[in-house]
């Protein structure tokens, strides 16, 4: 990120003063691990995971991003929530499926989803390896990749469309968001792909 640890701590303290409870920060690794916030209330080291859920009030579930897409989930009764870090690696590997499964095992019936700001489909140039990583989603995934003219083996990937496909595959069809691009909206969002050395945005969800 390029920021001094003291500045990060100061910013997080300021953010905490505006929140109803302590956020449980994660050590995000582009994986699929999901943790329950209620198991990490003691202020220990950040859990190594890419999704966090809450089954009760008294904590905040944050996800840090700067091109990867934050995905917020909640059951319609409002007593279960989760936040997931959905870059292409985590999305292809199952971070959303794992998060939805954990919510369902905790009692969620109908789940709503919101896709936060991430790299948009006109800016996310990828190679054949990324396209291949989503083959398991079937023919519908192919429409999320548009070949780049004059660049064999290169595609523009639609991360929100892929997220919607993944969500639909696990029964989540009420999905909002996914229309903000971190790369293009320079004055609004941090972007690692655009700036390399940059800050991170925190997207959060909690139970009242």
Label each PLM-derived region with a short phrase.
Residues 1-208:
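Active-site microenvironment for binding and transforming phosphate-containing groups
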């Amino acid at each position: 990120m390029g920021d001094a640890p003291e500045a990060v701590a100061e910013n997080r303290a300021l953010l905490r003063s505006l929140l109803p409870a302590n956020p449980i920060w994660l050590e995000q690794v582009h994986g699929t691990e999901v943790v329950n916030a209620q198991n990490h209330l003691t202020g220990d080291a950040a859990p190594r995971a890419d999704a966090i859920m809450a089954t009760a009030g008294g904590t905040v579930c944050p996800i840090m991003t700067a091109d990867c897409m934050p995905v917020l989930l909640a059951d319609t009764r409002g007593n279960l929530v989760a936040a997931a870090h959905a870059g292409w690696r985590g999305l292809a590997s199952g971070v959303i499926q794992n998060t939805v499964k954990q919510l369902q095992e905790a009692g969620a019936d109908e789940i709503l989803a919101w896709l936060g700001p991430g790299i948009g489909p006109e800016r996310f140039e990828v190679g054949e390896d990324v396209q291949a990583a989503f083959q398991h989603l079937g023919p519908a995934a192919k429409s999320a990749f548009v070949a780049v003219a004059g660049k064999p083996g290169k595609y523009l990937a639609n991360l929100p469309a892929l997220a919607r496909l993944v969500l639909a595959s696990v029964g989540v069809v009420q999905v909002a968001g996914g229309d903000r691009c971190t790369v293009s909206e320079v004055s609004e969002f941090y972007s690692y792909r655009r700036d390399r050395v940059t800050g991170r945005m925190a997207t959060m969800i909690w139970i009242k």
